[in-house]
């Protein structure tokens, strides 16, 4: 019998899930600035992102558009966030330059 690993392939022990306003725009930003690869995206009939997954280096993040009817609100909607993400990249100067271009 094969052993089932408790962490799915491509994931780490902790995987952040971001709720944002304008998830499609955020995905493009993460691709352009951090070199993220889009693993998958599920869009609703209105085009809003219901769920998406990105790979940045060896880490996966999940994100979706805010959906207040389900209790999911973005930091913008609640006036800030108690959460920070630390992203380790080999060339910080390049990332800063890209972030200024794609802001």
Each predicted region: which residue ranges?
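Core segments of cupin and vicinal oxygen chelate
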Residues: 8-10, 17-61, 66-67
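General secondary-structure propensity
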Residues: 1-2, 65, 88
